[in-house]
Amino acid sequence: MINDILKDAENRMKKSLEVLADDLAKIRTGRAHPDLLAHVTIDYYGVETPITQAANITVLDARTLGITPWEKGLSSKIEKAILTSDLGLNPTNLGDSLRVPMPALNEERRKELVKLVKSETEAGRVSIRNIRRDANGDIKELLKEKEITEDQAKKAEDDIQKITDKMIAQADALAAKKEQDLMAV
């Protein structure tokens, strides 16, 4: 019973961390990274489709992405989608492929992105804390129904707190790494 609650809480917290890691990966640093375009979509036969499902995205060098669409007619759609995204990128259409150079980030934009990293991280922390609250509520429910003793409940709540502290530390580590990447010139 208690172990199920602990495992469920830990798994849900890990999923929250994965979501946070995905959200942080979408924030542009000065380096080229294929995940940067993961949330950009194009109209592909009437369906909004991520670029990653309609083209190969490769890193040509530290500051340039190469995009090779699987169909020739998609180059212009992909170019338009990247231009209208909020990433501030200007792709170059080479006909059968695209090159996407990453402009250097200015200091003001870096600070905005660091604020965004902090807010995303705080949202991740709140999610983890909500999971802790739910798990503690489940433990209190078991105690109320006399299925566990007070000592077992206290130990379970301590275990949940340890898991929560560990997950929040991992979230902070992800944020610190992203901030370091952003501030590196």
Curated annotation (Swiss-Prot):
GO biological process: cytoplasmic translational termination
Protein location: Cytoplasm
Family statement: Belongs to the RRF family.
Cross-referenced NCBIfam families: frr
GO CC entries: cytosol
UniProt-listed Pfam families: RRF (PF01765)
Keyword line: Cytoplasm, Protein biosynthesis
Protein name: Ribosome-recycling factor
